[in-house]
Each structure stands twice: as structure tokens, then as C-alpha cells.
Amino acid sequence: MINEIRKDADSRMEKSVEAFKNQISKIRTGRASPSILDGIMVEYYGASTPLRQLASVTVEDSRTLKINVFDRSISAAVEKAIMSSDLGLNPSSAGSDIRVPLPALTEERRKDLIKIVRNEAEQGRVAVRNVRRDANDKVKALLKDKEISEDEDRRSQDDVQKLTDAYIKLLDAALADKEKELMEF
């Protein structure tokens, strides 16, 4: 029973770290990358649809993304969705394509992005700690029902704490890498 709780906590903590890494991969650095636009949702016939389903996004050069919209009638909606995102991008239409120039990151914008990344990291840490709390609560319930001894309870809590520390270290390492990447000129 305790092993199942530990395995569940391990997999949930791993998912939290992966979600954090996925989230920060969308935060742009100085280079153009189609993944920057992954989180963009476009209003399409009354439904919020991911941009990836409505258009192909390619890198035109190191500072420009090119979006080829499959249905030209929604080009304006795609532009609006990109402008209203918190990425600070200004797309421009060029026939059937939309070009998204990526402005050079100013020192101020880099610092803003680092704040955003740190906030995401804190949310990741909170998610990992919530998993720890859930696991410890399940173990406490087993102790209360007298299914395990106090020694097993203590040992299990120590194991879950070690897992928590390991996953928070992974989060912090990913945070440090992203901060370093953002500060490169």
C-alpha cells in the first residue's frame, strides 16, 4: 500500500516537472522557434482552437516566424490571437501568410521574462509540494486506520520528502538553464 502511494507521488511529481519544462519552453528567448506560438488559441467558429490545428508555423529566419493559415478567412482572427497573447508580438499579413517578426529582447524584457519563468517555477514547486501533502495525508489515513505502524508512517514521510527534494532540484536546474538562456545576448 505504501509503495503504491510512493509510486503515485513519484509519477505525479514527474508530471509536474514536465509541465513546468513544457511551460517554459514556450517562453521565447532571442531565437525564433515555432513552439513559441504553441499556447495560442484562436476563436474559430465559436470554439477556441489551437493555432497548430489552423495553420503551419515555420521559421523564416532567425528573427521571423511565418504562419501559413489553412483557411484564409481566419487570418484576422489568428493575427488578433497573437497580438492579444502576452508574448509581445506584432504579426503582419502578407497575402496568405502571416509574418511574425520577433523583436530583439531588451534588458527590461529579459528581466520580465525571468520573472515569469521564476513564477512558473514557483507554481511547479507548489504542485510538487501538493503531491507530497496528498501522499502524506494518504499515509496518515492508513496510520489512523491502524493499517501501518508509526515507524512505517515516519519512514514513508521521509521517503516522500526525499522524492520532493529531488523533483524540486530538477525544477531549480531547469529554471537556472532557462534564466541563463534568457540572459545570453
Curated annotation (Swiss-Prot):
Q: Name one GO biological process term.
A: cytoplasmic translational termination
Q: Give the matching Gene3D superfamilies.
A: 3.30.1360.40, Ribosome-recycling factor
Main location class: cytoplasm
Annotated keywords: Cytoplasm, Protein biosynthesis
Quote one Gene Ontology molecular function term: ribosomal large subunit binding
- What Pfam families does this protein map onto? RRF
Could you tell me which InterPro entries the record lists for this protein?
Answer: Ribosome_recyc_fac, Ribosome_recyc_fac_dom, RRF_sf
Its biological function? Answer: Responsible for the release of ribosomes from messenger RNA at the termination of protein biosynthesis. May increase the efficiency of translation by recycling ribosomes from one round of translation to another.
UniProt family annotation: Belongs to the RRF family.
Q: Which NCBIfam families does UniProt cross-reference here?
A: frr
Q: What is this protein called?
A: Ribosome-recycling factor
In its UniProt entry, the species of origin is given as Serratia proteamaculans (strain 568)
